[in-house]
Structure formats: C-alpha cells, structure tokens
Amino acid sequence: MTDFGDINKDPNEPSEANTGMLFTYACTYVKYFSMNSNYYYPWTQMYPGYMSEKNNNQYGAFGGPTMSTSSYYLYPLKNCQKIIDFNSDETEKGKPAIVQFGDNANQIAVARTLMGFIYMHLTDALGPLPYTEAFQAGEENFTPVFDSQETIYAKLDADLREAYNQFNESGSLSTADILFDGDIRAWKKLNASTRMMLAIKLADVDPAEGRSRFAQAYADGGIEENAYNLNYTFEANTVGYLYYNGVNYNLSLIHISEPTRLQLIS
C-alpha cells in the first residue's frame, strides 16, 4: 500500500460550515406544536397546563414533569447565530460554503428573523431567558444572565426591525430555505407579523408602547394572504417510515382482537 491517505481527515464530514445546511436544520424546529421534552411548539397558550400540573399531580395526563430549552439554544438558535457570525466575518463571508446559500445581508436577516420567532415563543412560555448574553461560552461566559421578558420583548422588536431593514429583495436564498423557498418578500412579511404579535401581547401591560410598535410593524406589511403563511411541509413518502408502520400494525391487532377497544382509546 503506497498511499494510505490521511487518517486524521474524515471524508464523510464537512471541512467547512455550510450556512445553507445550518439554516435548513434550524427551520425544522418550527414544525412542532408545543414545547415539551426537547420539542418546540409555537402554541404557547397550551403550555401553562404542563408547567402547573406537576405542582399538583406527579403523574398526570399531560405527562410533562420536566423540560429544557437546551436543545433550542444548541440547535436552531445556535445555527442561526453561526450564520450571522459567518456572514459578518470578512475572512469567512466570501467562501463558497457561505455564499452558495445567498447574499450575506439576506442570510443575516433571515437568521435574525427566525431567531426572533423562536425566542418570542420561548419567552412567552417560560418568561426570563438568556438573550443578551446568549452564545458567549467561547468568551468563557458559562452563566449568562436571564433577561426579563420586558427586556427580551424590547430587544426582539429592535433586532427584528434591524433585520427587516437588512433584507435585499433583489437577492434571494437557495432551496436550503425550506420554509419560503428563498422568497425574501415572504421573510419580510414574517418579520413584520412577528413584531405585530409581540406588540399585541405587549399592549396588555403597556398599551401605548404596544400600539406604537404595532403601528410600525403594520406599516412594514405583514402576512395578509395564505400564500405567505409560514408552513412546514412534510414528505408524503412513507417508505421505511418506522413509526407509521408501527401504528398500522398495532391498529390491526386491535381490530382483530377486540374492535370495541379502538373506540375507547380514540
């Protein structure tokens, strides 16, 4: 054997971060319906029952005795932060693995918008969270401050407005954007709609400020038609679909053994 190769290089692992791949994975976190056991769901109005139940009943129907935000910081939020960092670094932003996803300004803008959307629902469910000092472990800040919800809402509105102004409608993103297929107009509408949602909730405690923020977001133009809805499309392919096959198998056993059981558990 004359050329054994380099055993310290894994040919199956990328040598450079690809921002398109980082963004695709971050987008997968919008599909969940609630937050529990490392899943993110935007319907935070349903979650207080999970949080309060364990104070009264250790084992209840909700089955949510523990929870953590670690997966959201580790994956979608961190991925978006890395996209922002790569596209802001003069030595990185021009590399093929970066620019193939789209122009730098739009990458930063969509990453900030998606982060804002996720942060909004996390703080709505949990209140204080690390925001201003998040992602500073590289600077040896391992105990970030938990910002108040008031601070987070103010920062989210400001950061989302900055992101909105960064969008370049003459540019686009690649198909790595699995939510809007690179449509910058759609991302701008989601950005403005997220700010409107923040403002409506803020108005419950600060009507004047909520009204002011809403007016600005509304003027920017939010989602007004179904064509611009935030949708997560699942594949119809069920080949090798383990859980789907398991459901079919178990249901068939119920039908065979005792059909009335299906009515009871449905």
Segment roles from a protein language model:
Residues M1-N55, G63-G64, S71, D89-E92:
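Membrane-proximal, proline-rich intrinsically disordered regions
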Residues Y50-P130, Q136-T175:
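Conserved, well-structured interaction surfaces
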Residues E140, D177-R185, L230-L253:
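Carbohydrate-binding/catalytic loop surfaces
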Residues I254-S266:
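Single conserved hydrophobic/aromatic residue that forms the stacking wall/gate
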